[in-house]
Every structure is written in structure tokens, then in C-alpha cells.
């Protein structure tokens, strides 16, 4: 996989650009699920007269290295008036990010989903500055900088009640287990961007092991819901969170198809560029769910 990425990079498509494509495709798949979940599909995906979505008409040019996605390469912006007048069902996305390039995909997806108007919690064990892998470090620093600028701008204007042009990302850096659980429990969708194709072994280290267990607990609640007829039941979870994994379910070996303890149990996996050996093993269905390949070398949505 590393050799394939290097080959693509040597042909003129940088790893930075590949990461932005991966994160964008991940957000696209997440957005499709969120649209299905909500009765309200949002002004950003209104249909034109010929049935074409506004999303499909949006400019998706690749970001230049060193530039963020602000003003370009994003879902169609939701205006303050649209947010104010629409009866928007509040949809929450929790994104679990590791400190490698798989986590970088999660940072990019968070940026797109927030700009699409969703409430996004980005959970990371380290700050953007502490990420050592490239291009995840550069990408996360750019997004984190934009988040801080947005917060400072809103504070200066003292806007606390008026709708904003874009939602911002709620960063949870090195959070407690209680904070992670609180975020996941309110999520409509959980994105797993913790461990990627480079993972191997039979155990996952902390804090990621606990994060995986907490995410899987939300799946267990969903199974309970299927057996509960009354929404007044104390065990009923109105969110019914699904899990989408970036590239491979965290804790699952993309090479061998074996699962570590613990391992994410995803509903859907967006794997980048090509199908990995482990993902065609029978065990992949249990941990990775349905699998879609994102053709990042020739990407056009």
C-alpha cells in the first residue's frame, strides 16, 4: 500500500492531495447515511429542477498544498438565513482520530461535515501539532488553525445566538473516557479513523482500546433498540449510531484479515485506492461491514 501511494505521488498526485481526497470521500459516504437518517435533508442538498443535487454541482477542485478548504472544495455552504428558517434535525457526528495518516483522513472528513452543517466532535489523543506523520500533521494543523480563527472571530463579534455560516468542529484533545463516552452517546454517526492499514498485532493500545470498546457499545444499544417496542423504555437509544471506518476497521489487519482485541465492528468501511487482502477474507464482513473502494487516483464525484 505504501509503495502504491508513493507511485501515485511520483506521478504527480501528492500524498497531501490524496489525503484530502480520502477525507472528502469519507465525508461523502457519511453524508449519504446522515441524509437517509434524517427526514430533513438540509438546504445543502436541495434538488434542482432536473433532479440533480446541489452537491453534485459544487466545485470540488483539489486544495493547494498549504491552503485550507475554506471557500473551496467543500459541500455547498449553508447560509445563515437557511439555517435560521429550516427545521433542521440536529445530527451529530463523532470522529475518532488516531495520530497517523488514518487520523488525518478523519480530520479532513470533520472539516467537510462541519461545513455541511453537521455538529462534529473530533476526538484525538494528541493535538494537531503533536501529530508526527505527514501529511496528517500539516493537514490537521491547517484545520485546527481554521477552527481557532473561527472561534476567535465569533468571540470578537460576540455572536452567541445567531446562526453561523458554517458549523465549527468541537475538538476533544486527550479527553477522559467519560468525555469520549458522552460524545459517542449523542452521535448519530461514528467515524473510525484511529488505526489504518499499517496496524498489526493481537492487541490495541490505550486510549484507543477503550475508544473502540465505547464505540462498539453504541452498536450494542442499537441491537437492544430492535427488541424494544416502546421509546419510553430506559434502555432505548434514540440515536442508533452507525459506524463508518476509514480504510479498515481499527484493530483489523488489512493484510491477514485477523482481528485484534478489541476491534471496531463497523457497518461500512471506505477503503482507499484498492481492496486490501484482509478485506476479502470472510472475517471482514463481521468487522468491516459493507466495503466501498474510494478510487482516489482518479477521483471525481
Residue ranges of model-derived segments:
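Short glycine/serine/threonine-biased micro-segments
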Residues: 21, 96-101, 194-196, 249
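Anionic-ligand anchoring segments at beta-strand to alpha-helix junctions in alpha/beta enzyme folds, i.e.
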Residues: 25-28, 90-144, 156, 165-177, ...
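YjeF_N-associated NAD(P)HX repair module
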Residues: 2-3, 187-301
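Active-site catalytic pocket residues across diverse enzymes, especially alpha/beta-hydrolases
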Residues: 34, 113, 117, 219
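Intrinsically disordered, low-complexity repeat/linker tracts enriched for polar/charged residues
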Residues: 40-41, 45, 50, 55, ...
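An N-terminal, well-structured beta->alpha segment
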Residues: 1-39, 90-91
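Alpha-helical scaffold segments in soluble metabolic enzymes
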Residues: 3, 21, 25, 29, ...
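Electropositive phosphate-/nucleotide-binding environments in soluble metabolic enzymes
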Residues: 12, 16, 20-24, 107, ...
Amino acid at each position: 500500500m505504501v509503495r502504491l501511494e508513493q507511485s501515485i505521488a511520483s506521478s504527480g498526485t501528492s500524498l497531501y492531495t490524496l489525503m484530502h481526497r480520502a477525507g472528502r470521500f469519507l465525508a461523502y459516504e457519511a453524508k449519504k447515511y446522515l441524509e437517509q437518517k434524517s427526514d430533513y435533508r438540509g438546504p445543502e442538498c436541495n434538488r434542482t429542477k432536473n433532479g440533480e443535487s446541489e452537491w453534485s454541482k459544487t466545485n470540488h477542485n483539489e486544495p493547494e498544498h498549504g491552503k485550507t478548504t475554506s471557500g473551496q472544495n467543500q459541500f455547498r455552504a449553508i447560509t445563515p438565513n437557511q439555517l435560521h428558517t429550516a427545521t433542521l434535525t440536529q445530527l451529530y457526528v463523532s470522529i475518532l482520530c488516531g495520530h497517523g495518516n488514518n487520523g488525518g483522513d478523519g480530520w479532513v472528513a470533520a472539516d467537510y461535515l462541519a461545513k455541511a452543517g453537521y455538529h462534529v466532535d473530533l476526538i484525538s489523543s494528541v493535538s494537531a501539532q503533536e501529530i508526527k506523520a505527514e501529511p496528517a500533521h500539516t493537514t490537521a494543523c491547517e484545520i485546527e488553525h481554521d477552527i481557532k480563527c473561527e472561534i476567535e472571530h465569533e468571540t470578537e463579534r460576540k455572536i452567541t445566538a445567531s446562526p453561523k455560516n458554517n458549523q465549527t468542529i468541537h475538538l476533544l484533545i486527550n479527553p477522559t473516557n467519560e468525555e469520549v463516552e458522552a460524545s459517542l452517546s449523542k452521535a448519530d454517526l461514528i467515524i473510525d479513523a484511529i488505526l489504518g492499514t499499517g496496524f498489526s498485532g493481537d492487541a490495541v493500545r490505550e486510549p484507543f482500546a477503550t475508544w473502540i470498546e465505547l464505540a462498539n457499545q453504541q452498536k450494542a444499544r442499537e441491537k437492544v433498540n430492535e427488541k424494544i417496542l416502546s421509546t419510553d423504555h430506559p434502555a432505548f437509544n434514540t440515536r442508533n449510531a452507525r459506524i463508518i471506518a476509514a480504510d479498515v476497521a481499527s484493530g483489523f489487519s488489512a493484510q491477514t484479515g485477523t482481528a485484534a482485541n478489541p476491534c471496531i465492528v463497523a457497518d461500512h468501511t471506505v477503503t482507499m485506492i484498492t481492496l486490501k487482502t484482509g478485506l476479502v477474507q470472510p472475517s471482514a464482513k463481521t468487522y468491516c461491514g459493507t466495503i466501498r473502494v474510494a478510487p482516489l487516483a482518479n477521483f471525481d464525484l
